[in-house]
């Protein structure tokens, strides 16, 4: 979260070289659910790369193959994984029934944004010009929720393969239904729930921020690009404060 500290709203009076302050930070990292834990891990040199958590992610028994050329498999079973986080949907204006249709990046983004505002001292009893506060996030173009929703639409392929294998119509439909039940249902909130740009929009909407809200996809440089755009937004005088990151 960055601010020019100007607040007069007049772009012509803002020096292009005016200093930009990082006035608050909110974060969720592997083995660090908040800023204090993250900083402590840095000081202690904690390596947060771990084995894949089978209970919440995927089983190496299903996807691990030491041969890098093996199709549809992976030869790595380690990475940085965040811990399960409690999320109260009503606090963020989301109906509980819509949680499954909302990508985790949108949910985690709102948590991190709230923590950044609190860390900056803007959460309670401190006024600021919300109309000149922007949200710019770095986010990949394909979100996690796209995978199960897309897979659910493959039922014609499953049905054809089952029937070609000699199964009768009743058994085929039973198997198709069982496979479908393992994926997230499509519903009216699925499309906004899987769109990357909605991550910034949800933050702006929930916290009543009227400045620019958008996302940028620059692959591994997405978060840094978002911060770069946030700095440009501040230097141009279009915003007094920007929530930025990814």
Residue ranges of predicted features:
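Cys-dependent condensing catalytic cores that perform Claisen condensation/acyl-transfer
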Residues: 2, 8-246
């Amino acid at each position: 979260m960055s601010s020019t500290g100007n607040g007069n709203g007049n772009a012509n009076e803002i020096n292009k070289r005016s200093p930009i302050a990082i006035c608050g930070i909110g974060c969720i990292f592997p083995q660090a659910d908040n800023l204090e834990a993250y900083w402590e891990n840095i000081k202690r040199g904690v390596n947060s790369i771990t084995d894949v958590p089978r209970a919440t992610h995927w089983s190496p028994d299903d996807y691990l193959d030491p041969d890098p050329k093996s199709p549809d498999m992976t030869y790595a079973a380690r990475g940085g994984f965040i811990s399960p986080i409690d999320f109260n949907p009503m606090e963020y204006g989301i109906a509980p029934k819509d949680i499954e249709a909302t990508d985790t990046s949108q949910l985690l983004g709102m948590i991190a944004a709230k923590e950044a505002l609190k860390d900056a001292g803007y959460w309670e009893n401190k006024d600021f010009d919300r109309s000149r506060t922007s949200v710019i996030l770095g986010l990949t173009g394909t979100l996690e929720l796209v995978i199960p929703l897309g897979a659910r639409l493959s039922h014609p392929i499953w049905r054809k393969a089952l029937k070609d294998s000699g199964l009768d119509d009743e058994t085929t439909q039973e198997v198709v239904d069982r496979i479908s039940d393992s994926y997230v249902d499509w519903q009216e909130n699925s499309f906004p729930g899987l769109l990357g740009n909605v991550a910034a929009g949800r933050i702006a909407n929930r916290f009543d921020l009227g400045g620019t809200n958008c996302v940028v996809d620059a692959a591994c440089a997405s978060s840094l690009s978002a911060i770069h755009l946030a700095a440009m937004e501040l230097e141009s005088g279009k915003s007094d404060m920007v929530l930025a990151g990814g």
